[in-house]
């Protein structure tokens, strides 16, 4: 088996374990916050710029950002149609819905796409991941606030960050990196070879910088409490969404790499943003963390190997 297959496991599981160890060793949370900021503002922006520097805009490429709509909102329809009453407490319901709809696309699906297709695959996935930021700000945060108010049984005004402040933050700089990379590609600016070499190194650095703080905040004791109660998330994320998105993508796309990147993004496990939203809006954090851990393990040990062999054996 190609050694590239194991890169994803090393870049996801090892920094998670390191983050947990750093918490035990008493590392300051402020240091981890600086790591997060440096990753988003500097490293992720550079990776977005460089990966899109080599992408040529086509009509098929336009489907990638549009595909985030069914990826995120099919789970919402399923939640309201079949799953809302699975939990009675609105704080549980809010965490459950957000855990079902948000995927770890930018980091985990992006890393898998890079292993399979190089910079091109990473760029394709980022075109799907960047619009998810808008979904989080425009839909997830307001819905989290709504479930919080329902759970608190009151509608008193609470101090929340304004929409403009949520949207216009340094966390959105990778989107500017995408735009800058596309401009450089459009004007046929030659990319230095050293930039590609640095990209190869930094994509792994970015994964470690992104997952280490997650491990630092993770409380494994919460995982077992909700693990079996969250089973409906698994067929939605790992069977329904990849199947539906593959079918939709074949209507607009002929490039096998794009198809695979959409499938990886559709099957991405619960995003750490789901945990962050639960923390920010007072929802059930334990439920969101349980979904994050269990779906991430299922993705790494089931879906990712299937997609990897699917590509390696020439099906795609």
Walk through the language-model features, giving the residues of each:
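Alpha-helical transmembrane segments of multi-pass small-molecule/ion transporters
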Residues: 1-316
